[in-house]
């Protein structure tokens, strides 16, 4: 048992440092943060982002949802909770709608604040006698749609929810290591998670850099995300020691919320933003498939 604990601690440290390395490449390299580059630069960034979208799509369908459904069904059968109601899917939908409602609240507050600031700006202009139109000035009605779309595409809230859902999933991946009882299984799962998480954190960092999040917060997100799998390993070790009866069921329910959150972020944030932007459509789809295929191959081999 002592040697098994040492193996788990080594896995904890390895996951932490490798995640930090791959996460800080997009965050610290100026090339990824340059939004005023050449057309070629913007195209390459867009293709990298499409690749990341394929990674997240694969993570959604081939990793997060299957893991959740397997865990929740195992727990329901173990507790002999038989029902015709699709409870696993309902829990996932609850996570989806939780993010949807929270985002609508945030957007509504932002729009109300923007409207208030607009009125505050217009009143002094009218008092100073500048009520006539300016032909060269921006038209609020015509530009509002574009501002709205851009905000939606790079919403810091959505980036945070992407970070949160991936962080929760990382905790559960760490739990899978912490709950193992044999050395070979710990090493096997750890290697699979190392490869998987390196690609995921790189893709997450690309998305965070492209959003309206300050660099310091991007670094904080990556640092916290890197800690999630080690935290999961520590929790798994603690659960094994404490032998909590309800632990696996609580884990499965939280996985369902994380899966629903991830479905929302993948299909309402990442894919629409990448595929609706103009230019190189077939090449974007190709890179989307490439990201998906690489993760699918890793899942197949793992």
Curated annotation (Swiss-Prot):
For this UniProt record, the keywords arranged alphabetically read as follows: Cell membrane, Endoplasmic reticulum, Ion transport, Membrane, Transmembrane, Transmembrane helix, Transport, Zinc, Zinc transport
Give the highest taxon in the source lineage. Answer: Eukaryota
Return the annotated region ranges for Disordered. Answer: 123-145
Q: Where are the transmembrane segments?
A: 7-27, 45-65, 81-101, 159-179, 186-206, 217-237, 252-272, 282-302
Extracellular topological segments: 1-6, 66-80, 180-185, 238-251
Residues exposed to the Cytoplasmic side: 28-44, 102-158, 207-216, 273-281
User: Where in the cell does this protein reside?
Assistant: Cell membrane; Endoplasmic reticulum membrane
Protein's membrane topology: Multi-pass membrane protein
Instruction: Give the record's GO CC terms.
Output: endoplasmic reticulum membrane; plasma membrane
Please cite one Gene Ontology biological process associated with this protein: zinc ion transmembrane transport
GO MF annotation: an example? zinc ion transmembrane transporter activity
Tissue-specificity statement: Highest levels in ovary, lower levels in intestine and gill, barely detected in kidney.
- Catalytic activity line of the entry: Zn(2+)(in) = Zn(2+)(out)
Q: Which InterPro entries does the record cross-reference, listed alphabetically?
A: ZIP
Keyword Ion transport tagged: yes
Task: Give the protein's biological function.
Answer: Transporter for the divalent cation Zn(2+). Mediates the influx of Zn(2+) into cells from extracellular space.
Family per similarity comment:
Belongs to the ZIP transporter (TC 2.A.5) family.
PANTHER family given in the database record: ZINC TRANSPORTER ZIP2 (PTHR11040:SF120), ZINC/IRON TRANSPORTER (PTHR11040)
Please report the name of this protein according to its UniProt entry. Zinc transporter ZIP1
Gene name of this polypeptide? slc39a1
